UniProtKB/Swiss-Prot annotation:
Pathway: Amino-acid biosynthesis; L-leucine biosynthesis; L-leucine from 3-methyl-2-oxobutanoate: step 2/4. NCBIfam families: leuC, PRK05478.1, PRK12466.1. GO terms for biological process: L-leucine biosynthetic process. It catalyses: (2R,3S)-3-isopropylmalate = (2S)-2-isopropylmalate. The gene is leuC. Binds 1 [4Fe-4S] cluster per subunit. The keyword Iron-sulfur applies. This is 3-isopropylmalate dehydratase large subunit. The keyword tRNA processing does not apply. Its cofactor is [4Fe-4S] cluster. Heterodimer of LeuC and LeuD. Pfam families: Aconitase (PF00330). It comes from the Bacteria. It comes from Rhizobium rhizogenes (strain K84 / ATCC BAA-868).
Amino acid sequence: MSAPRTLYDKIWDDHLVDSQDDGTCLLYIDRHLVHEVTSPQAFEGLRMTGRKVRAPEKTLAVVDHNVPTSPDRHLGIKNEESRIQVEALATNAAEFGVQYYSASDKRQGIVHIIGPEQGFTLPGMTIVCGDSHTSTHGAFGSLAHGIGTSEVEHVLATQTLIQKKAKNMLVRVDGQLPAGVTAKDIILAIIGEIGTAGGTGYVIEYAGEAIRALSMEGRMTICNMSIEGGARAGLIAPDETTFEYIKGKPRSPTGEALEQAIAYWKTLQTDEGAHYDRVVVLDAAALPPIVSWGSSPEDVVSVQGIVPNPDEIQDENKRTSKWRALDYMGLKPGTPMTEINIDRVFIGSCTNGRIEDLRAVAKVVEGKTVASTVDAMIVPGSGLVKEQAEAEGLDKIFKAAGFDWREPGCSMCLAMNDDRLKPGERCASTSNRNFEGRQGFKGRTHLVSPAMAAAAAIAGHFVDIREWN
């Protein structure tokens, strides 16, 4: 009888083509997502060696990082480098027979949002993309992670990837979330607990009552930020919530094929007694709405907390690093988080740009007005999310409140398009990274949930969504 296995072990074993004595392994890849930034050199490499894309039907390309999100984006991209990358993806997709969603296609959107909504992402699969937040797809019980440009070429050519197996970590979130606390708060709390290096060398499986209670959108938010916790990937075992989400998607199996798939997907659970190399447990009931204060996703406190004092940190290097973060962020120790005023609000990204996120925002801002000191924008994660939001009348609520309602794309999550912060501007953002310059040169980013960002836009400063009226 074989030893009990984790979910990660099972998916790994199912895709193992070959293994060497030094631990180097060759994995079969089921799905490959491609965007305009990390793919041009990969396609050029194929061209130079006379190779083809081995499995174009398992490859899906979309523009997201560089595309403008303004209503006039049909007029083209101003930045020459960005324009060349977008044009190259269109050319490469056509030449190599890969399905491609252009900016004018309503299916276009952020790569990690379009995969699931098209049914391209399915449980038990290995999924890669030249983008670190590929971990998002792990919400379906698939092994998904980012790869480098040379690896993009390798997968295009061979449909395989050279890897070494990571260790297993379990993060269990027990109990029920209080009102006003969301999946975004869970993952920020986890990163605050383990640190940005806490998951290094691991694949994290998320489990527990609070995780099971999440929608697929919430689970994607959790897995999306696994990389910010240092992990290679994040996984959540599939269940009825997963199966219901998948049904009816354009590329999902149907009929008898779906029944057979679900029978297999139900086996994608960690066996009782399986070994984890590390276990972390959080109590959901104790979690507050969370705000980041520094320039690392581990720099987090409760919205009712204060900016911490780095002098209380024992480690000298870490103490110096946190003082630098405070200097960059323009904050002083002891400042209550609710007294921090903001200039900008960005709601969107592959972390929080889905319909559930937009509904949460609408609930907060309906009948209210964005503060006169705040410039706030909402960027749907895909054309289909935008279409759904408008069908529900959410866009009217946003516009009436004074939000800028945009076209789909990565937008202000990263300073690679026209949406960016000016030096010194402070932003409440639903994205995943608050590094120096991430949203624009000398821009200051605070990571929060969609509801918290929405409330901050109205108040002009951070507020506790649990007390919001």
